[in-house]
UniProtKB/Swiss-Prot annotation:
One of its GO terms (cellular component) is extracellular region. The keyword Kinase does not apply. Keywords: Disulfide bond, Ion channel impairing toxin, Neurotoxin, Potassium channel impairing toxin, Secreted, Signal, Toxin, Voltage-gated potassium channel impairing toxin. Its main location: secreted. It is found in: Secreted. Negative results: does not block Kv7.1/KCNQ1 channels. Has the structural arrangement of an alpha-helix connected to antiparallel beta-sheets by disulfide bonds (CS-alpha/beta). Residues 1-24 form the signal peptide. This is Potassium channel toxin alpha-KTx 30.1. Belongs to the short scorpion toxin superfamily. Potassium channel inhibitor family. Alpha-KTx 30 subfamily. Disulfide bonds join 30-50, 36-55, 40-57.
Length: 66
């Protein structure tokens, strides 16, 4: 295969990992969903969740929610 393709894959992977690291710096770390309730209270119509060790505020766009 062309070496340019492998270079592109390596560079794209590096960019994704860098973006993930930068994006995670402003997130609140958590161990359970209860840790995220205060963090998500700044938004409306969201449900707090602890995903991957960080708080996520999930918005239901339809479907089944509990």
């Amino acid at each position: 295969m062309n070496t340019g393709f492998f270079f592109f894959v390596i560079m794209a992977t590096g960019l994704v990992l860098t973006f993930d690291t930068i994006h995670a710096e402003d997130k609140l770390k958590c161990t359970k969903t209860d840790d995220c309730a205060k963090y998500c209270s700044q938004f409306t119509d969201v449900h707090p969740a602890c995903l991957g060790g960080y708080c996520e505020c999930l918005r239901w766009e339809g479907g089944i929610s509990s």
